[in-house]
Each structure stands twice: as C-alpha cells, then as structure tokens.
Amino acid sequence: MVPDENDDASDDQSSQLSGLLDQLHTLVEVLADIEEEGGHRHESGRIDRGNARIDYDYDVSIGLGRADGSSYDEEPSSNRSRSEQRSGQQRTTEDSIHVETRGGTSGDELVVVADLPGVTDDDVDVALDTDEQALTLRVDDDVVERVVLDRPDVAITDMTLRNQVLEIRLARTSDTDGGEST
C-alpha cells in the first residue's frame, strides 16, 4: 500500500516529538546554567501589566543536599530550634513582604493586607499604637512593617492569616469625622 500524501498524521507526530525534544533541551540548558552558578538560584521581583501586579519569589537548588540549604552531615532541620530555622527564611521574608492598605466594604473600615511568605500564625504579632496612629507588624519579634494610619480613632475588628496572606480589618471607634470622641 502506498502512503497517502494527504495524510498529515506522521507530520503531526514528528512536530510534536520535535517540540518535546526542544523543551527538554531547554530544560537541560537551564539546569546546566544553575549548576555553573553553584547549584542555587534565587530571584524575586514584580511584574506590572495594566491593572495586574504579580509579585514572584523563587528558589531553585540542584545537586546533593537538603532543600533547606543544610548539608547531609548537619542535623536535620526538625532538630534545629525554631529561631535557627527562621533565620534563613527571615532574610527572604523581609525582602519579599508586600503590604497594601485598602478601603473596606463600609466607609468607616480600613483593610491592611500583607503578603508574608513562609510565615505562620505563631510567628505574627500585630500592635495598634493609637498615640502614634500606626499599625506595627512583627514577625518573630522583629518589626517588618509599620503602617501609618490616617485615622486617629480605629480598632482592629478582625485579623486572619490564610495562605500566608495576613488581612487586618480596622474600623472607626467613634462616629465623628474629626477624630475627637464625644
């Protein structure tokens, strides 16, 4: 039987195979570049496209060793103290924290949103200083952000940490616009 010249199935299979091999080749080249850089690559940044903003932070290691950066002759991270485990993460955390203030659903509500990579409930502490009109955010007893508030008479009404994103809701404590209590 003579192959049908109109049959493109063999062309599709060869182009798919070629595309897969090209992707595999690119992956091997990137891994070789990381190997030349000492087996570790870490980058972070921000991409703004129109109304969208994307913050990214990645850490890639290849070769022998643990994901936390310790070698196999060091004690496992589960045997190290919590502060020792956090010290390596803290540099990354402080560099990649992003805090944003927004208006809430009601006119008297203010929402502070903080992206806190690698942070758990036990690590976070928030303090409201009404004299200074500021909200202080601490991670492991270190001040990582201080948000100056434009409203003198606010109180924290809700605080949640989900997927390493902290949301703090503040509301006015009085009905006046001037900030004076009646």
UniProtKB/Swiss-Prot annotation:
Induction: Part of a gvpF1-gvpG1-gvpH1-gvpI1-gvpJ1-gvpK1-gvpL1-gvpM1 operon, maximally expressed in early to mid log phase. Gas vesicles appear earlier when grown in static culture, possibly due to O(2)-limitation. Pfam families: GvpH. The keyword Cytoplasm applies. Its main location: cytoplasm. Disruption phenotype: A single deletion produces very low levels of gas vesicles, in situ. Deletion of gvpG1-gvpH1-gvpI1 prevents gas vesicle formation, cells still express gvpA1, in H.volcanii. A single deletion produces gas vesicles throughout growth, in H.volcanii. GO terms for cellular component: cytoplasm; gas vesicle. Residues 1-21, 65-106 are annotated as: Disordered. It is found in: Cytoplasm; Gas vesicle. Keywords: Cytoplasm, Gas vesicle, Plasmid. The keyword Translocase does not apply. Residues 92-101 have a biased composition (Basic and acidic residues). Residues 12-21 have a biased composition (Low complexity). Residues 1-11 have a biased composition (Acidic residues). Encoded in a 14-gene plasmid locus called p-vac which produces predominantly short, spindle-shaped gas vesicles during all stages of growth. Belongs to the gas vesicle GvpH family. GvpF to GvpM interact with each other in vitro, and may form multi-subunit complex(es). Interacts with GvpC1. Might interact with GvpA1. Proteins GvpF to GvpM might be involved in nucleating gas vesicle formation. May be important for the stability of gas vesicles. Gas vesicles are hollow, gas filled proteinaceous nanostructures found in several microbial planktonic microorganisms. They allow positioning of halobacteria at the optimal depth for growth in the poorly aerated, shallow brine pools of their habitat. Expression of a 9.5 kb p-vac DNA fragment containing 2 divergently transcribed regions (gvpD-gvpE-gvpF-gvpG-gvpH-gvpI-gvpJ-gvpK-gvpL-gvpM and gvpA-gvpC-gvpN-gvpO) allows H.volcanii to produce gas vesicles. A similar region restores gas vesicle production in H.halobium without the p-vac locus, but it still has the c-vac locus. This is Gas vesicle protein H1. The gene is gvpH11.
